[in-house]
């Protein structure tokens, strides 16, 4: 017997929530039970998150991240004012289109804090991709790394000087 990862249908927050839930081998009922949802359709609230009919609150998002053992940044709705949102968007895009490449001409980009964070993160990501391609790490380890990317180190990277950086940092506290 083997397990094949389900396909990511799109990059919406709801689809990412569903994708990770399935990856963790959980049902909607498992999640409803964990959160203590009751009533006739206990998984209705969570289904509305996965179907993009409702957005989880910041507190609920932190709780979901805890249940799924992922960074909140992997499952939050992206606004792209934050460099972390850009990085995670590309990582999720790779789940939809495996092995796509990002090429940078590092000498031609504007030297801003935003771009530096993206450049450093992509460089680290490229190193992990190489490890996966050389079979130094398993695909599962690579995906876990992406789900938890910068979860513990984000506080050190983000200075909190700009509004978008503060938004990212508040999820990590």
Model-derived regions: residue spans:
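Short, charged, amphipathic alpha-helical segments
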Residues: 139-147
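Short basic helix-loop element that most often maps to the first helix and adjoining turn
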Residues: 14-35
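Residue-level signal for the short linker/turn that defines the boundary of a DNA-recognition helix
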Residues: 12-15, 25-26, 41, 56-59
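Recognition helix of helix-turn-helix/homeodomain-like DNA-binding domains
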Residues: 36-56, 77-81
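Mature, Sec-exported extracytoplasmic domains of Gram-positive
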Residues: 40, 50, 121-123, 132, ...
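Short, charge-rich amphipathic alpha-helical segments embedded
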Residues: 150-164
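Short, Lys/Arg-enriched N-terminal segment that forms or immediately precedes the first helix
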Residues: 1-5
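Charged, helix-prone or intrinsically disordered regulatory segments positioned adjacent to compact structured domains
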Residues: 6-11, 19, 55, 59-62, ...
């Amino acid at each position: 017997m083997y397990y094949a990862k389900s396909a990511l249908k799109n990059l919406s927050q709801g689809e990412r929530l569903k994708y990770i839930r399935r990856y963790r081998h959980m049902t909607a009922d498992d999640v409803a039970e964990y959160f203590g949802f009751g009533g006739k359709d206990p998984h209705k609230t969570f289904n509305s998150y996965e179907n993009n009919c409702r957005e989880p609150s910041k507190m609920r998002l932190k709780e979901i991240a805890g249940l799924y053992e992922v960074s909140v940044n992997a499952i939050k709705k992206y606004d792209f004012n934050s460099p972390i949102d850009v990085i995670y968007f590309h990582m999720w895009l790779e789940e939809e289109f495996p092995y796509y490449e990002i090429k940078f001409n590092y000498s031609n980009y504007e030297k801003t804090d935003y771009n530096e964070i993206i450049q450093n993160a992509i460089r680290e990501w490229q190193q992990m991709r190489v490890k996966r391609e050389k079979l130094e790490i398993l695909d599962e380890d690579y995906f876990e790394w992406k789900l938890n990317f910068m979860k513990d180190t984000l506080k050190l990277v983000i200075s909190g000087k700009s509004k978008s950086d503060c938004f990212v940092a508040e999820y990590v506290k």
